[in-house]
Amino acid sequence: MKTSAIVGIILAGGTGSRLLPCTKVTNKHLLPIGEMPMIFYPLKKLVGAGITDILIVTGTEHMGDFISLLGSGKDFGCRLTYRVQDEAGGIAQALALAERFANGQPMCVILGDNIFEDSIEGMITDFTNDPDKAHIMLKEVADAERFGVAVISGDQITQIIEKPMEPPTNFAVTGIYCYPGDVFDIIKGLKPSARNELEITDVNNAYIAVSRLGFSHFKGYWSDAGTFPSLAKANELVTLSAPHF
């Protein structure tokens, strides 16, 4: 079933510095996970949820490689558009480049190094049932200090803390987000963080401040693939669960 009102955005930029020297010659999202390039996984998740109008944001150096690999999107049952991120400036800065593409429509955003088992159809349903709210996916993890961590009270997220030394919960904020079209107004009001980036955590906390952030939990596995240990883990999970892909 086509989810025509929602566009998809895959953020596949960044330097991949934690995967050097492999990323000296290619973008990390083109590295293999199981039998496919990493970028195939978020693409297939979006298409599987009926989202077929998709933007890929990546840097200048390897843009041609993405186009050579993915083309128009026809082979995947979607229509692909590409946007260059001239320099790394944070996840929210990369998302801001999608404003013209989204054109006021709601969107599902996936960080291209997130590998996960569950379908996102349930998340999309929850989002479309309450479209004024943003919606994020959480996953309980053992190493929550590596991620943004959600503080939950009842059925509400009260705060997201970015990479806390002593996490108050083990609920990591994964790189899968649904946003209404006004997310770009929020991004325009952000100030750079201490590392001089526009942080997606600040976007999500802005929605929390006005009680407009919903959430769901992943039941199956989830892994980012931005470090060698997590890349190896993602390969292991995909290999063991090959029928799901």
Regions found by a protein language model. Give the residues of each.
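Conserved N-terminal catalytic core of the sugar/cofactor nucleotidyltransferase
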Residues: 1-10, 18-21, 32, 36-110, ...
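Short alpha-helical oligomerization interface
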Residues: 24-29
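A structural signal for short hydrophobic beta-strand segments in well-ordered beta-sheet cores
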Residues: 30, 150-152, 215
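Short, conserved catalytic or adaptor-binding loops enriched in Gly and charged residues
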Residues: 71-77, 151, 206-208
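Conserved beta-strand termini and adjacent loop/short-helix elements that scaffold enzyme active sites
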Residues: 83-85, 137, 216-218
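Catalytic-core segments of class I nucleotidyltransferases/pyrophosphorylases
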Residues: 108, 124-128, 156-245
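Conserved donor-nucleotide/metal-binding helix-loop-beta segment in metal-dependent transferases, i.e.
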Residues: 118-146
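Conserved catalytic core of nucleotide-sugar-dependent glycosyltransferases
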Residues: 146-148, 152-158
